[in-house]
Amino acid sequence: APLAAGLPESIDLYIANRGDKLLGLMPDARRTVFWIHNPARYLMKWRYLSKLWRIKPAIIFIGDYHATTYPALAPSGMRVVIPYGIAPPFSDVGAADEPPPRRAIFTSNPLRSLDWLLDLWRDHIRPNVPDAELHLFCGAATYGSVGAEKAAEMEQVLEHARSMRHEGVVLNAPVAKERLVEEFASARVMLYRGDINETFCLAVGEAQAAGVPAVVQRIGSVVERVIDGQTGTIAGDDQAFAA
C-alpha cells in the first residue's frame, strides 16, 4: 500500500480523495485539497462539516453543475472546477468519409433513463425512421460491486430492451474501450437524457471526443458535455429530443 511506510512529516500539497477520514491525515501540509466526484450533498454530515470547517481545504469539483450541489454557505476554502480528462483512444477517431448508418448508441447506466429512451424510441423515433437501429452497450459488469447490488434492477430494464429487438434495438454487453471506439465510429448519434445524480457523464464525453453528435436534455451535467447546435442538441423536452 502507498502509505504502508507511514506519512511524511510535511508536504507542500496534500490531496484527500472523497473520504472524511483522509481529510485530517496531514495537518502540517502547506495546502490541503479535497477532491470529490459524487453529488456533494453527502458532505452535509457532521463528520465532514466539522473537518471542512476546521481545515477549509480547496474543494475540487468536476463540473459547474457538480459545484452547485454543495451549498454556498457550507464550509470550504477555494472552490475549483477541474473536469475529468477523456482517454486518448476516443479522441483519436478520424473523420468519416461518409455519414455512418442510421444507428444510435447508448453507453450509460441502464438505470439512468434507458426505460424512458426505449419508450421514446418505440413510440416516436423509430416510427419516423423505420430503418434506424439503437445499439446499447451497458450492463451491471461495468460497475463492479455496485453493479452487482443493482443487477436485478438493471436486468428488468435490459429485458425491456431485449423485447424490442424487432424494433431495431440491439443489446450488447459492455465492451472494452478499444472496441467502444470502433462502435462510436459506426454510430450517427448518441442518445442520452441525463441524470440529476451525474456530475460529469463520461459516456457522453467519450462519444463527443470520438466525434459522435449527442442529443441530451437539460438534466444534470450532460449540458456541459454538448455544445448545443454544434456538437449535438440540448433538447428542451421529450418532443424535441425525439425530433
Predicted features and spans:
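Extended catalytic core of nucleotide-activated donor transferases of GT-like folds
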Residues: P2-P57, D64-Y65
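Donor nucleotide-sugar binding/catalytic pocket of nucleotide-sugar-dependent glycosyltransferases
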Residues: K56-P71, P75-D92
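Conserved catalytic-core segment of nucleotide-activated headgroup transferases in glycan assembly
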Residues: P88, A96-S163, L171-P174
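Short alpha-helical donor nucleotide-sugar binding micro-motif in glycosyltransferases
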Residues: P174-K177, E182-A187
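Acidic donor-binding loop of glycosyltransferase active sites
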Residues: A185-T199, V212
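Short glycine/serine-rich donor-binding loops of glycosyltransferases
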Residues: C201-V204, V222
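Short acidic/histidine- and often glycine-rich active-site loop of Leloir-type glycosyltransferases
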Residues: I219-G229, T233-I234
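C-terminal "capping" alpha-helix adjacent to the active site of nucleotide-linked donor transferases
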Residues: T233, D237-A243
